[in-house]
Amino acid sequence: MSKFKGRALLLISGPGSESDVQVIRDSANTALEPFTLHVQDAQSICMGGRIILALDIECDPAHLSAIETDVRGAVEKFRCDVASEII
């Protein structure tokens, strides 16, 4: 049985190229380090000068707002937006 109480999607989107995806992913992962969670899956797409990075995480849903805030702070220097949704 998982110690996590829920799952959520974190979506990060903004301007960028394929070479920016890993840098943005690394920044997001650094922001996630203080939290007790597990990244189930990560997918990215780069199209038309934009990137979308999706992270499927297991976490405590009560912490999702703080997780989103910290990730937003980590990627705002790349002019990225962040959204989250409990699934």
Predicted regions and their residues:
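A conserved regulatory-domain signal marking ACT and ACT-like small-molecule sensing domains
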Residues: 1-87
